Design a protein with these regions (language model features):
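SAM-dependent Rossmann-like transferase core, predominantly class I methyltransferases
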Residues: 23-32, 37-45, 173-216
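Conserved class I S-adenosyl-L-methionine
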Residues: 28, 43-64, 216
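Conserved SAM-dependent methyltransferase scaffold
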Residues: 64-67, 83
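Conserved SAM-binding motif I beta-strand of class I
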Residues: 72-78
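Conserved SAM-binding loop
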Residues: 86-87
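A short acidic, Gly/Pro-enriched loop at the edge of an enzyme's catalytic core
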Residues: 102-120
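A short glycine-rich, Lys/Arg-flanked "PGG" loop and its adjoining helix->strand segment in the class I
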Residues: 127-143
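Conserved beta-strand signature within the Rossmann-like core of class I S-adenosyl-L-methionine
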Residues: 140-152
């Protein structure tokens, strides 16, 4: 069996990346074509600069945060493993982890932001909560790029983006990945997030709070 590839080649450079948790016989890379598509789009459309305020959302193992670390991005995720992998991969590439601000799903990223990169999560409830909370951080000039693998992108993703953020423009599929550009529409009325869902456990005094992407 050939060893799994651990070096990602991107317009921003060459980066060593590994997944978490570590497995003796790892079968999967720490990035996918959707990560590569986002980084290619950034290289083509965004002029590098220290003043660009970047927010990365749902970065599985830190591929995006590592490649864009020179821009001091915020990395917003509900996964502790993602945070660990991001820190490990920053260190593995000689990058100070303090340069990337990790934000968990119960925290609100700082705004405003100029560039948002979103990897579509498996659970659309999480995406809905994130988009609603993201909206106040956007300006009319914010560039929002959304990506995922074609097989994991239901049509409801487009409907949700257009309802909560603005008009979408979909690029051609590339390496079985899809990229969506979103133009923020600040005139849209965005509802309050329905999360966390709260209910009282039958027969007890316990009030249960169920956050997006948490199952009970």
């Amino acid at each position: 069996m050939n060893p799994i590839e651990t070096t990602m080649q991107a317009p921003q450079g060459s980066f060593t990346l590994q997944r978490r948790p570590r497995r003796r016989r790892e079968l999967l890379r720490a990035w996918d074509a959707a990560d590569e598509y986002l980084l290619r789009e950034v290289a083509q459309q965004i002029r590098p600069g220290t003043g660009v305020r970047v927010l990365v959302v749902n970065d599985s193992f830190g591929a995006l945060a590592v490649a864009l670390a020179s821009w001091a991005p915020q990395a917003w995720s509900d996964s502790f493993l993602s945070q660990l992998a991001t820190r490990d991969n920053l260190l593995a590439n000689g990058i100070d982890p303090a340069g990337v601000t990790q934000v968990n799903s119960l925290q609100q990223p700082a705004g405003p932001v100029d560039l948002v990169l979103i990897k579509v999560p498996k659970t659309l409830a999480l995406l809905e909560d994130q988009l609603i909370r993201l909206r106040p951080l956007l300006t009319a000039e914010t560039k929002v790029l959304v990506a995922g693998m074609v097989k994991a992108l239901p049509r409801s993703v487009w409907a949700m983006l257009e309802k909560l953020l603005g008009a979408t423009d979909t690029a051609l599929a590339w390496k079985k990945a899809r990229l969506i550009r979103v133009t923020p529409d600040l005139t849209l009325t965005v509802p309050d997030s329905p999360y966390p869902v709260q209910y009282r456990l039958e027969g007890t005094d316990w009030l249960i709070s169920n956050h997006a992407n948490v199952f009970s």
